[in-house]
Amino acid sequence: AITTGRMKPEEKDLFKHLDWMYWGEWINVLSQYHVGVQLGTAAAGTFNLNCSFHGIPCIAYSNSNTQKTLHPNTTVELGDIVRAKKIANRLKDEDFYNKCSQETKRLFEEKYSERVFVNHVKNIMESLDETN
């Protein structure tokens, strides 16, 4: 597992810590990993989103919208470490891993791809034009 940004002292020997880096470098570094784990405080949900971009299954809590949307088979309830461990072990099964990987890629394309974003912004701009 890796961490970026702020590392807690008790994590020193548990995780490989990556120094802060620009997003362009980060997204390339992330692509080298097989599974994402985000069992900490939920924030903007970008880690879950970035994992999905690469087709990397992410085990995380259900209090992140991007997690619930993009990784339905690897989402656990807040604090459910037992289920998170079971999912981590299940991801060792190639068929389950591939199912999760393909599903998150598909969901990313449907919900968060550049095409979806551009259409969303276009709709907003058109609705603003209609109100003026």
Across the structure, where does each feature detected by a protein language model lie?
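Short, hydrophobic beta-strand segments that form beta-sheet elements in well-ordered domains
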Residues: 1-6, 36, 58-60
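Nucleotide-activated donor-binding/catalytic signature segment of Leloir-type glycosyltransferases, i.e.
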Residues: 2-24
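Short acidic alpha-helix that forms the nucleotide-activated donor recognition element
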Residues: 22-33, 53
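Short alpha-helical segment that forms part of, or immediately flanks, the ligand-binding pocket
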Residues: 27, 46-54, 67
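Acidic donor-binding loop of glycosyltransferase active sites
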Residues: 31-43, 56
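Short glycine-rich donor-binding/catalytic loop of glycosyltransferases
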Residues: 41, 56, 60-67
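A charged, aromatic-enriched C-terminal amphipathic alpha-helix characteristic of glycosyltransferases
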Residues: 92-126
